[in-house]
Regions:
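N-terminal alpha-helical transmembrane segments of multi-pass membrane transport
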Residues: 1-98
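Membrane-water interface regions at transmembrane-helix termini and the short interhelical loops
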Residues: 28-29, 52-65, 120-130, 147, ...
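Transmembrane-helix bundle segments that line or gate the permeation/cavity pathway
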Residues: 80-116, 123, 132-158, 186
Length: 192
């Protein structure tokens, strides 16, 4: 198993999440909310991880199905673990497991929530919650593949691990271009 490449890809994915965590900071600044500070800690940790292990690509850079499965599983867990931190740090969801549930619900677009009054959240947290649903709607890993532009062979193994069903072999060769088109359409039609 190519653990160096797994670490490299995961750190690049976490680097993407660190950038996404900075968007609610801008929203907080626009609405003059102090709770936006809660996004800086996880974003800083993720940026540090990215610069420690996600910048230099390992010499042995091939991955196969087994590595793809490990990367997909760990990516879902790590994105949710770090994505839950702002809810807990801000104090609006003090129980970390509840915040984790809320974030997993967003990234998987299940629609479940532990919040009784979602609108009571500050705008930056409400934006982050909505962003997790938006990203999850198209698939976290497809989104990251579009942004990180891994080589086609490695992307194929990650896509096969992410996409369910027997038709995934037909999807994979054109998945990157299809995903870019879909995200372009989604951005164009979003009322964000």
């Amino acid at each position: 198993m190519n653990t160096k490449m797994i670490r490299y890809i995961l750190c690049r994915m976490l680097g993407v999440e660190s950038v996404l965590l900075m968007i609610p900071v801008i929203v907080a600044a626009l609405y003059q909310e102090m709770s936006g500070i809660a996004f800086l800690i996880p974003a800083g940790i993720l940026l540090l991880l990215f610069f420690l292990a996600g910048v230099k690509k390992p010499e042995q850079s091939h991955i196969y199905g087994k590595e793809g499965m490990v990367i997909v599983a760990l990516a879902w867990i790590l994105w949710s673990l770090f994505g839950a931190m702002p809810f807990t740090i801000s104090g609006f969801i003090p129980n970390y497991m509840d915040a984790f549930f809320e974030t997993v619900s967003g990234f998987t677009t299940t629609g479940s929530s532990i919040l009784r009054d979602v609108e009571a959240l500050p705008q930056c947290l409400l934006f982050w919650r909505s962003l997790t649903h938006w990203i999850g709607g198209m698939g976290v890993l497809v989104f990251v593949l579009v942004l990180t532009s891994l080589d086609k062979k490695n992307s194929m193994y990650l896509m096969r691990a992410e996409v369910p069903g027997p038709e995934k072999d037909k999807l994979v060769p054109k998945a990157m271009s299809t995903a870019r088109i879909l995200y372009g359409c989604l951005l164009y039609t979003s009322d964000a």
